[in-house]
């Protein structure tokens, strides 16, 4: 989309479609459009408290204990956070994550290289062959306005990722379970006013509180 405007009875969304410009009207606009959410930015709904950066490769040949998750810490491989090796059947996912302000000008790939070349543990990585790689931001900390009149944010766009592991699927489903029953009832009556949405967004206060507690514990131990 390149435009979205809230009216009393609907949201008007304009977008580039396969046949040119298209205009769509909807009762509720759901922004489930990721860490760089256009919906969140367009409506100035706030930013996640922090955005971590994760880099992960999938490898064969990792010399770890069968069925066991390995975690590695250290400022040279994941400053302020940790790295991991997670078995997934025939392959292992090896990754590292941190925050941009802790990276001292290095890239996520460089930190992962440090992990793979660490003299204390590199015997586990000697036979590894990379088969895939993934990199991206991990937004954590529920945004200031997850719901406004006729607009709701979900998942990464709302900043629901766990501050301890970066996981977003579980919290995303939990957010859906919390909000959708109320939103569905309100949509039946087309009652999605600012006051109503503010009331529904209060359901996320406990999630935000848990994020703050877990972030404090993470920062205390890593």
Task: Please tell me what each predicted stretch does.
Residues 24, 37, 67, 133-136, ...:
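Generic, low-specificity signal for short hydrophobic/alpha-helical stretches with a mild N-terminal bias
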Residues 73-90, 136-155, 204-219:
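A broadly tuned preference for mixed-charge, low-complexity surface segments
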Residues 68-77, 94-101, 127-141, 174-177, ...:
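Noncatalytic linker/hinge segments flanking ATPase motor cores
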Residues 41-42, 164, 214:
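Short, function-defining helix-loop hinge/capping sites that tune catalysis or transport
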Residues 1-123, 139-143, 159:
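Predominantly flavin-linked oxidoreductase catalytic cores and closely associated redox partners
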Residues 181-222:
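C-terminal helical "tail/cap" subdomain of flavin- and related membrane-associated enzymes
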Residues 3, 103-183, 187-188:
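FAD/FMN-dependent oxidoreductases across multiple families
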């Amino acid at each position: 989309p390149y435009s979205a405007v809230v009216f009393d009875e609907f949201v008007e969304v304009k977008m580039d479609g396969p046949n040119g410009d298209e205009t769509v009207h909807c009762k509720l606009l759901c922004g489930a459009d990721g860490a760089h959410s256009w919906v969140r930015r367009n409506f100035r709904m706030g930013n996640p408290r922090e955005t971590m950066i994760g880099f992960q490769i999938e490898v064969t040949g990792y010399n770890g204990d069968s069925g066991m998750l390995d975690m590695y810490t250290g400022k040279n491989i994941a400053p302020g956070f940790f790295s991991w090796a997670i078995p997934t059947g025939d392959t292992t996912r090896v990754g590292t994550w941190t925050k941009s302000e802790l990276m001292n000008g290095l890239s996520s790939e460089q930190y992962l290289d440090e992990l793979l070349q660490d003299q204390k543990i590199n015997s586990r990585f000697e036979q590894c062959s990379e088969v895939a790689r993934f990199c991206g931001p991990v937004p954590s900390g529920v945004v200031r306005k997850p719901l406004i009149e006729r607009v709701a944010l979900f998942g990464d766009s709302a900043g629901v990722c766990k501050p301890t592991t970066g996981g977003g699927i579980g919290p995303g489903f939990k957010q859906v379970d919390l909000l959708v029953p109320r939103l569905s009832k309100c949509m039946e009556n087309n009652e999605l006013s600012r006051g109503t949405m503010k009331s529904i967004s209060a359901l996320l206060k406990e999630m935000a509180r848990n994020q703050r507690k877990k972030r404090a514990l993470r920062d205390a131990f890593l």
